[in-house]
């Protein structure tokens, strides 16, 4: 049995889980998400717990078991609490500002870069050097944060670029220089 797959998913108050063939809909205070489920797996909703069961110990079923359980758990957390990914901007003159719903990045190019949020994603800029990406879909929040980071990846030699807040800053040593 998959160690992750067999764990029950606690459903907080205010969150509803509906199971239909091939789909699990999760509705909560922050919104609604649907998770596709393989027809081979069985999703059981009890009072305030959701369980995923698999028909056999085939490799394919074991893989789908843990994956499906995690996707449903992420959806439950997303509609109840939401997800946040924080980015830091480092570099002289590098900054971000909120323009309507989108953000405008000044990161060393000859022009500012404007990033439009996809549906279900919002941006916050608490400081000119910090960006917060918020949403209920974990995958979408992570992808948008990765797209923003890719605009100006962290430099290997200088502490410049867009970093995840929890990302360690790794700098390579520069040239050793000529000895006298």
UniProtKB/Swiss-Prot annotation:
GO terms for biological process: cytoplasmic translation. One of its GO terms (cellular component) is cytosolic large ribosomal subunit. It comes from the Bacteria. GO terms for molecular function: rRNA binding; structural constituent of ribosome. This protein binds to the 23S rRNA, and is important in its secondary structure. It is located near the subunit interface in the base of the L7/L12 stalk, and near the tRNA binding site of the peptidyltransferase center. It holds the Pfam family Ribosomal_L6. Signal peptide: none annotated. This is Large ribosomal subunit protein uL6. Part of the 50S ribosomal subunit. Belongs to the universal ribosomal protein uL6 family. Keywords: Ribonucleoprotein, Ribosomal protein, RNA-binding, rRNA-binding. The lineage of its organism: Bacteria, Thermotogati, Deinococcota, Deinococci, Thermales.
């Amino acid at each position: 049995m998959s160690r992750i797959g067999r764990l029950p998913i606690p459903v907080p108050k205010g969150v509803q889980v509906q199971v239909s063939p091939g789909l699990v809909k999760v509705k909560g205070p922050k919104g609604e998400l649907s998770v596709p489920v393989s027809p081979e797996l069985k999703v059981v909703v009890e009072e305030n717990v959701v369980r995923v069961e698999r028909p056999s110990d085939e490799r394919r079923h074991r893989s789908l078991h843990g994956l499906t359980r995690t996707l449903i758990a992420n959806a439950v957390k997303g509609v109840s609490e939401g997800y946040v990914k924080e980015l830091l901007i480092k570099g002289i003159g590098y900054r971000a500002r909120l323009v309507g719903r989108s953000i405008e990045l000044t990161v060393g190019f000859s022009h500012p870069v404007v990033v439009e949020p996809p549906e279900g994603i919002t941006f916050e800029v608490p400081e000119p050097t910090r960006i917060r990406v918020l949403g209920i879909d974990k995958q979408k929040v992570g992808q948008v944060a990765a797209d923003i980071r890719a605009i100006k990846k962290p430099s290997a030699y200088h502490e410049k670029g867009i970093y995840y807040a929890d990302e360690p800053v790794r700098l390579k040593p520069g040239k050793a220089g000529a000895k006298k």
